[in-house]
Swiss-Prot record:
This protein's encoding gene: RRT14
Biased composition range(s): Acidic residues: 201-216
GO cellular component: nucleolus
Name under which the protein is recorded: Regulator of rDNA transcription 14
Signal peptide (from-to): none
Annotated localization: Nucleus, Nucleolus
Sequence ranges of Basic residues compositional bias: 161-170
Length: 216
């Protein structure tokens, strides 16, 4: 449409509005009210669309976050499982080594290298074996291995304790039955040296005194 046509249309519209304003003053206001309502409807429609868009974006962000958490959780779970399997394999290997060491010890074929490995395994796992409840199918075998380990660590301690007990027993016997040559008078057994028995005769006293004079 040309600019002249637009101007003509605009003039016609203004003339109609002026006429309606003079005849029906409320007509123009109604027209404006309808325009406002349309604007409000358009604004509400736009706001609703924006709200939907924001919600969609938020849901997508939440989905991405949940996916990240799920992936991270699965990764942690997988690493724990791998670590647990590695620990289990190491324990089984140590048990197998202990069985070999046990056999060699019985046969007196335990090498120096095996002895060092045995001591290392014992020092590493002794406390853990003491405090742990074993629930595997090889319970009996593991108990046997545990007993072997405990025996290896307690042999030297038992020897020292036995030696100490023997020493204390000997000291107690010596204290209870002291040497008669050093603590008793041969003439009067059971008396403390230097004390005469009750009822000693005067003759014995005088004879002892005479002997003493003759000695001088």
């Amino acid at each position: 449409m040309s600019s002249t046509g637009k101007a003509t249309e605009l003039q016609a519209t203004m003339a109609v509005n002026s006429l309606l304003s003079n005849i029906l003053p409320g007509a123009n206001k109604m027209r404006k009210s309808n325009d406002n309502n349309n604007n409000k409807k358009n604004s509400k429609g736009t706001s609703k669309a924006q709200l939907i868009d924001r919600n969609l974006k938020r849901n997508l962000e939440i989905m991405d976050l949940d996916t990240h958490k799920f992936t991270k959780k699965n990764k942690i779970k997988k690493n724990k499982k791998i670590k647990k399997n590695v620990i289990k394999q190491n324990e089984l290997k140590e048990i197998a080594d202990l069985e070999i060491f046990k056999k060699h010890k019985i046969e007196n074929n335990l090498t120096l290298s095996e002895k060092k490995k045995l001591n290392k395994i014992i020092s590493k796992n002794l406390n853990k074996i003491k405090s742990r409840e074993l629930d595997s199918d090889d319970q009996e075998e593991l108990d046997d291995v545990q007993k072997f380990i405990l025996d290896q660590t307690s042999n030297s301690q038992s020897y020292n304790k036995s030696k100490k007990r023997k020493t204390r027993r000997k000291e107690f016997k010596e204290f209870k039955n002291p040497d008669k040559n050093s603590s008793m008078d041969h003439r009067y057994p059971g008396l403390t040296p230097g004390l005469a028995p009750v009822g000693l005769s005067d003759e014995e006293d005088s004879s002892d005194e005479d002997d003493d004079r003759n000695d001088y």
